[in-house]
């Protein structure tokens, strides 16, 4: 794991790159978050980071048995009778790197850079899904000038590979009457519904036959890429489908 000096140094590098982007408080918190390793199913470091963040603010902070972190912030003056709100984001990120990059997602923080109008990571995934949602909630929790009702910040784990954090929630952990999920693509849109998802397990009997053929390595790369949920209808090349077609022929 990063020692303290490495952690602080990486935050400084990241924040220097992002220091002129508004709102600065969100990008500051995103820089801090991205200095902490947070792969799915191995979120121990980021759980400890968020727990310490809430405790340092003097807010009621708990970690449930599966690893979700809940931070509660009382309503500001005059907002006590409004419906309490739950703000939710997930702590884990998709961990992918370029083939020519030597990077360990379990021990290293993400290095960010500004490229024109874009914030990018150097050779790895950025972690904006759902790091920007987490950073936004952190910024609201530490703000002193935003009127709000009672707030409950819910940081779930393992969204990318199983939803075990959300599935592990138990009745009574939250009291909020409105849930805001901060895991959408546009910051000026509010989604009021979701199609949901389905997991399918397919099995088939097969037998292995001996072969004296030559082994060939096939690599499919250079495709457009994209999110399997948001871009599935756009007809982009899919490496799995392309390889399947090659094997079929």
Q: Model-flagged regions — what are they?
A:
Residues 2-10, 15:
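Short hydrophobic targeting helices and cationic amphipathic motifs
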Residues 17-117:
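Acidic/His- and Gly-rich active-site-bordering loop/insert found
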Residues 79-155, 159-161, 166-168, 176-177, ...:
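Active-site metal-coordination/substrate-binding segment of hydrolases
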Residues 37, 109-111, 115-120, 124, ...:
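Midchain, well-structured core segments that form catalytic/ion-binding scaffolds
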Residues 62-64, 150, 249:
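Flexible, glycine/charged-enriched surface loops at secondary-structure junctions
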């Amino acid at each position: 794991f990063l020692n303290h000096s490495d952690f602080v140094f990486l935050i400084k590098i990241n924040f220097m790159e992002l220091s002129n982007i508004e709102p600065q408080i969100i990008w500051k918190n995103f820089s801090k978050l991205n200095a902490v390793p947070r792969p799915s199913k191995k979120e121990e470091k980021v759980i400890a980071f968020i727990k310490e963040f809430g405790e340092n603010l003097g807010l009621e902070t708990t970690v449930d048995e599966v690893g979700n972190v809940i931070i509660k912030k009382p309503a500001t003056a005059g907002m006590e009778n409004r419906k309490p709100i739950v703000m939710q984001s997930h702590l884990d990120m998709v961990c992918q790197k370029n083939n020519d990059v030597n990077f360990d997602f379990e021990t290293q923080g993400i290095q960010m850079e500004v490229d024109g109008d874009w914030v990018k990571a150097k050779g790895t995934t950025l972690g904006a899904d759902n790091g920007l949602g987490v950073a936004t909630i952190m910024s609201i929790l530490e703000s002193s000038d935003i009127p709000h009702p009672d707030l409950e910040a819910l940081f779930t784990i393992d969204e990318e590979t199983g939803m075990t954090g959300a599935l592990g929630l138990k009745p009574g952990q939250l009291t909020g009457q409105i849930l805001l999920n901060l895991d959408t693509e546009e910051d000026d849109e509010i989604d009021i519904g979701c199609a949901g998802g389905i997991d399918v397990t397919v099995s088939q009997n097969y037998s292995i036959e001996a072969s004296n053929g030559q082994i060939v390595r096939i690599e499919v790369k250079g495709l457009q890429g994209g999110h399997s949920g948001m871009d599935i209808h756009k007809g982009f090349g899919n490496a799995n489908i392309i390889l399947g077609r090659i094997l079929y022929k």
